[in-house]
Amino acid sequence: MRRFDSTLRLLVGLSLALAGCYGAYQIKPDEPRSMSGLTPNVEDKDAGMVAVAPGFDLKTYRVIAVNQFQVTDSNVKDDDDRRLAQSMSVFLQSELVRRLRESELFERVVNLTETPMPAGPPNALRIDGDIPRLGQGSQVARAFVGLYGGGRTRTQIEMRFVEVSTGKVVMLTADRRVASMGFFGGDSKDHLRESFDDAARDLAKFLLRLSRGEAPRP
């Protein structure tokens, strides 16, 4: 019995240690979409892959609005999948709004699900986007072989920064996140929420760097 208790404590301790070391993490995006002559193929340590239109100056925009993203993953097929997709899209939008407000880069950050776009705002940007990858993976597989990537959750976020006054796409980003470790594999929805929260946080960090004149960099 003592040996069993010791083994159980060791396994629990190892799982907790791994949970602390392995959360959601960023990997290379899968075939990000091009648009308006831009292709997100420049690596950035925070935003993933980006493409910035020539002459784009973030500091000239004082208002930014965030749309709800559409989940376009072909594996979303049944009602449970659709409910998950809807909840994660809402969560991502709220996290983007929160992180952008905390950054203090803009005078106003608008959640377009809650508030219409202000009429005629000067120098405004709108963030549109898609979630082309969204998968819960397998908690059982993560618990047993998560150290080797088995059963991992996955998500990919592709954003379009649109100049409101002209409709011109001025920047694209593509950010892919996966998670394969956690306490007894970790809850899939928790892993996905962590991925979206981290992506929103890191996008704000990228925009802060961009506003200081720094170029995207690995």
Please give the residue ranges for each predicted region.
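C-terminal motif of bacterial Sec signal peptides marking the signal peptidase cleavage site
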Residues: 18-20
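A structural "domain/chain start" motif
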Residues: 22-95, 175, 205-218
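Sec-exported extracytoplasmic/periplasmic mature domains
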Residues: 96-105, 136, 179, 204, ...
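Extracytoplasmic/secreted envelope proteins and their assembly/folding machinery
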Residues: 89, 93, 97, 103, ...
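Surface-exposed patches in mature extracellular/periplasmic domains of secreted proteins
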Residues: 102-116, 214-215
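Bacterial N-terminal signal peptides that target proteins for export
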Residues: 1-11
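Short secondary-structure boundary motifs at beta->alpha junctions and helix caps
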Residues: 149-156, 162-209
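Surface-exposed short loop/turn segments
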Residues: 24-33, 109-166, 181-186
